[in-house]
Regions:
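An amphipathic, basic-hydrophobic helix/alpha-beta surface used to engage anionic
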Residues: 37-294, 330-334, 340, 348, ...
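Acidic, Ser/Thr-rich peripheral helices and adjacent loops at domain boundaries
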Residues: 297-304, 359-361, 368-394
Length: 427
């Protein structure tokens, strides 16, 4: 009940006792109404003099960017800019998805004019743009101890970016590379490490590259060529459609898809390539290609804000604007599930000269472990497995390299086995 309601109830009791005392002509009953009348009068005077506390809120964070699952230290400073506050209670309003790991989010104190109080706590945040909206402030009146509550807005935002797993080696061979030196084999002769071919000696060739064994056989000067290594254009494509990212309870395939996108982007940027990010879901979120740490920060910020969506216009991959991607470049796509229409679109991309790596997070083992054994479960598992084999076979026929990632294991070790030079030779 609000303070005015309480005072009204007390006045009603006092008036009722007074009327009853007059009717029964009993002074004791009439006198019993006096304490209630005095309390109600004092409360009314106290309410008329009560003012909202004049306080300011300052919040300090140990970092404005963290990796999901890490902790962040928060310090809240409350300063009294008005008259003395005898009793003041402050409680931080913490959203449900943030986990408090240590410290206190509330405090109680008496504040003189110009004084301040401080409390600190530590929280853990999942991936995304997170905000602390403000604090709930409670004061009590001096005489009646009636509480007055108000919310003081003071929003502080921070970003929890996805985990980027370190990857050792990925061998890509796009049809087109840039002119600058890098680590991607360009399928062109020149200066490099790996042997590429030979040609007849011409004026200006480096004599240290003359193949003397060939000269001994042919009596003609033959020069060795080595394969050039350059940087490449790489686009990380994150499929954020609802139907492509199934969930199992609180576990979401999309969480692992975002981590895979961050890991792949980090690797290719570290190798000096030009990397862009395209998120296909609620809308087309395009991060223009770039280089270096600043580009990695932009990509992580976009991935931190990424969410799944179910929009009819983006139901399949036909709406993908391929003109955004550099011609005949490398595409790294991450999707939890594909259908026949998606495979058809990927075939068109391959026909246009794009090299495609498809990473598919797989939570099937986790899901099967949560379902009790039955004939229905075994039949459903068989159907899902057969359908997946059909999709994977169709992708292999059009030349898409598929990495089927069981999320219970490490992505880095799987990529090192399937996409590295050594792994491909052994395969």
């Amino acid at each position: 009940m609000s303070p005015p309601g309480k005072i009204g109830a007390i006045l009603a009791i006092a008036i009722s006792l007074a009327i009853a005392g007059v009717l029964v002509r009993d002074g004791r009953v009439l006198a019993a109404s006096i304490p209630f009348l005095l309390y109600a009068g004092i409360a009314l005077v106290s309410m008329s003099e009560a003012k909202k506390p004049q306080i300011t809120v300052e919040r300090r964070l140990s970092a404005d960017h963290i990796v999901e699952g890490e902790t962040i230290d928060v310090t809240v400073i409350i300063t009294n800019t008005g008259p003395r506050i005898p009793w003041l209670g402050v409680a931080e309003r913490v959203p449900r998805h943030l986990e408090i790991t240590s410290g206190e989010t509330t405090c109680f104190a008496s504040l003189e004019e110009g004084a301040e109080i401080t409390f600190s706590y530590t929280l853990r945040a999942p991936r995304g743009l997170r905000a602390l909206p403000g604090v709930d402030v409670t004061t009590w009146q001096r005489i009646t101890l009636t509480p007055q509550r108000q919310f003081v807005p003071h929003e502080t935002q921070f970003l929890a970016v996805p985990i980027a797993e370190p990857i050792d080696d990925i061998d890509i061979r796009p049809e087109r590379t840039r002119a600058y030196a890098g680590v991607v084999r360009a399928n062109r002769g020149g200066s490099g490490i790996d042997f590429f071919g030979c040609h007849a000696y011409t004026t200006g060739d480096d004599i240290r590259r003359i193949n003397w064994r060939a000269y001994a056989r042919t009596r003609e000067l033959i020069v060795n060529e080595y394969e050039q290594e350059r940087i490449a254009d790489v686009t990380v494509f994150l499929d954020a459609r609802d139907r492509a990212n199934p969930s199992i309870g609180s576990e979401k395939t999309f969480t692992y898809a975002v981590r895979a996108a961050a890991s792949m982007a980090k690797y290719f940027i570290k190798q000096g390539n030009s990397v862009g990010l395209f998120i296909y879901g609620e809308y087309m979120d395009w991060t223009f290609p770039g280089y270096g740490k600043d580009q990695m920060t932009r990509i992580l910020d976009s991935l931190a804000r990424a969410e799944t969506a179910d929009k009819e216009v983006f139901d399949d991959l036909r709406a993908v604007p391929t003109r955004l991607f550099p011609p005949r470049s490398q595409l790294v796509m991450i999707s939890g599930s594909l259908d026949e229409h998606d495979v058809e679109v990927l075939g068109v991309l391959r026909a246009h000269g794009y090299r495609i790596i498809m990473i598919m997070p797989d939570m099937l083992r986790c899901e099967i472990g949560q379902i009790p054994e039955s004939e229905a479960r075994d039949l459903a598992l068989r159907i899902v497995t057969l359908r997946r084999k059909l999709i994977l076979g169709a992708l292999a026929r059009i030349g898409v390299e598929v990495v089927q990632w069981d999320v219970s294991g490490s992505l880095a070790s799987l990529v090192a086995w399937t996409l590295s030079r050594r792994g491909r030779r052994l395969a």
